[in-house]
């Protein structure tokens, strides 16, 4: 395939222009995306934002490029961490540190603050499959944690919308992660990093081996990463939800431990309506008068119970094989397997409600520890049950077999099949059964009744607490199957240069399912819930792109180095 553009590239000069941009500590440079053949001649390559190969250093749209050297200098441990330093990736992007996440353990990109579903993620120019769980229940996105840092050669970020080139997913822009194409030898990497507080140790190991022969080349990478967790109270800025001392707001919860009682208007005992605090240090048997004597709400600082940065373990393997079939065709296979495990914690379950909704925040008059002798409502935190624990495991498999081929002297084609599958299990512990909790609240037997009038541990017996605890399970899966064929080449010589054309077609099928456990789906978990969903869709697309040079090297005029027009057309049909 070297011969395809050889005659023309001899006429072209590469203008070696570079620009260094610095933002938040990461050097960003417009580096050449230019390949050379064995004779040192420039070989056109496809850059992000166009399907037409070129030897130019820049395409028609603004692109930020981060090469391997800059990645190493950045100190970023994941692709998500690397892209988080871009100023263009801002509002609307979440990473694995996001609490209350509907897609825990993931990392996305939101270019220009438009949301993660509007930024298209590519790996070597082809789509990365969507994560198996939607963020905020509706936002489909691709997780950068599916991509091992060890195989990344460079990252190209297209900062403009590119729907005519890549489809409707590319409204905000495109992130194209380019992996190694050819590697020979053996490379072993090991690193360890930690915070100045010495509490977030991170280990990374990778080994890459590659070989090149007469008929092709191949490489394989095996990598492992482990990072310790950090709790919110390990840092001063996040130690408390009460930020009034720093000029902020008090975000502490109104469901505390000790909790609060709400007396409704028309109390049978003649108490004035309002909130009243269970006394601090209560052993579980305060009188009604002691509670009424402390109006107000006991607040709960949930930050010390929460994970700031979750515990991570990732491992996987990636490989690429390029094999020359004939002088005109080369076959390739790119395979990736990833396993990701995440552990994070949330504050214990809160309980609150009112008499009109039949929820779990109602204390019946029958409760063995109710000193009021009438139904009332309360706000309480079940700290004795313990923090809610989440263990998430992702498994990712991706394979792309394909072939590149020459068509005549100045056209190249490519056809490939992509299969991307992701399985996720989210296992939760220390959740509270709504039915069991309401039963314990209604019990008149001190041995089985739940006591909301204590503070701290040791108020309720282990048997009462064990009867409340339930586990949750959420299983999700996404699959992407796509076939594409494309070609690009020269059409006609114009005074300003060569008129070039790219055409292509693709067909894809996507399937997704996100199924929760029966208790969660029936809203039988206190202060928690969920929905199950599944679906599929197919997409067919065709596109064409034309590069029309108007002014070039042969007809250059004063003040204009080059001038051209790029026209792109794309049609998509979803069903």
Give short role names for the model-derived ranges.
Residues 156, 183-211, 300-309:
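Short strand-turn segments of transmembrane beta-barrel domains in outer membranes
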């Amino acid at each position: 395939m070297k011969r395809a553009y050889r005659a023309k590239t001899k006429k072209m000069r590469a203008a070696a222009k570079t620009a260094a941009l610095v933002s938040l500590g990461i050097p960003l440079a417009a580096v050449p995306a230019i390949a050379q053949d064995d004779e040192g001649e420039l070989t056109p390559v496809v850059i992000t934002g166009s399907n037409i190969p070129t030897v130019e250093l820049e395409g028609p749209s603004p692109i930020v490029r981060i090469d391997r050297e800059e990645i190493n200098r950045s100190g970023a441990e994941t692709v998500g961490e690397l892209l988080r330093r871009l100023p263009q990736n801002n509002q609307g992007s979440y990473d694995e540190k996001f609490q209350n996440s509907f897609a825990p353990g993931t990392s996305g990109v939101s270019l220009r603050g438009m949301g993660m579903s509007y930024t298209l993620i590519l790996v070597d120019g082809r789509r990365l499959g969507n994560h198996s769980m939607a963020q905020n229940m509706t936002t489909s996105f691709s997780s950068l944690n599916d991509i091992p840092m060890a195989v990344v050669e460079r990252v190209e970020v297209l900062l403009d919308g590119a729907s005519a080139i890549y489809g409707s997913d590319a409204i905000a822009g495109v992130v194209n992660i380019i992996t190694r194409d050819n590697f020979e030898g053996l490379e072993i990497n090991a690193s360890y990093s930690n915070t100045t507080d010495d509490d977030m140790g991170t280990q990374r190991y990778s080994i890459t081996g590659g070989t090149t022969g007469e008929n092709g080349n191949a490489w394989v990478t095996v990598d492992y990463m482990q990072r310790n967790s950090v709790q919110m109270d390990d840092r001063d800025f996040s130690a408390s939800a009460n930020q009034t001392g720093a000029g902020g707001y008090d975000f502490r919860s109104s469901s505390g431990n000790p909790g609060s009682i709400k007396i409704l208007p028309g109390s049978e005992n003649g108490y004035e309506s309002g909130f009243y605090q269970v006394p601090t240090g209560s052993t579980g048997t305060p009188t009604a008068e002691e509670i009424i004597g402390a109006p107000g709400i006991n607040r709960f600082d949930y930050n010390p119970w929460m994970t700031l940065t979750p515990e991570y373990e990732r491992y996987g393997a990636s490989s690429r094989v390029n094999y020359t079939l004939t002088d005109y065709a080369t076959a390739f296979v790119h395979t990736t397997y990833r396993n990701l495990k995440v552990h994070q914690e949330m504050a214990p379950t809160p309980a609150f409600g009112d008499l009109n909704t039949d929820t779990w925040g109602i204390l019946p008059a029958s409760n063995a520890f109710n000193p009021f002798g009438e139904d009332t409502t309360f706000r309480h935190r079940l700290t004795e049950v313990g923090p809610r624990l989440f263990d998430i495991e992702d498994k990712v498999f991706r394979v792309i077999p394909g072939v590149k081929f020459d068509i005549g002297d100045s056209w190249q084609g490519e056809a490939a099949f992509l299969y991307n599958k992701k399985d996720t299990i989210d296992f939760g512990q220390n959740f509270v059964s709504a039915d069991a909790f309401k039963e314990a609240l209604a019990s008149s037997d001190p041995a089985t009744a739940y006591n909301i009038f204590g503070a701290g541990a040791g108020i309720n017996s282990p048997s009462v607490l064990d009867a409340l605890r339930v586990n949750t399970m959420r299983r999700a899966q996404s699959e992407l199957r796509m076939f594409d064929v494309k070609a690009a080449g020269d059409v006609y010589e114009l005074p300003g240069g060569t008129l070039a054309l790219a055409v292509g077609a693709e067909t894809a099928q996507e399937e997704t399912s996100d199924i929760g456990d029966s208790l969660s789906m029936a809203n039988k978990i206190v202060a928690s819930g969920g929905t199950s969903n599944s679906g599929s869709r197919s997409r067919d697309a065709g596109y064409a792109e034309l590069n029309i040079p108007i002014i070039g090297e042969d007809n250059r005029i004063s003040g204009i180095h080059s001038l051209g027009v790029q026209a792109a057309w794309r049609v998509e049909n979803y069903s």
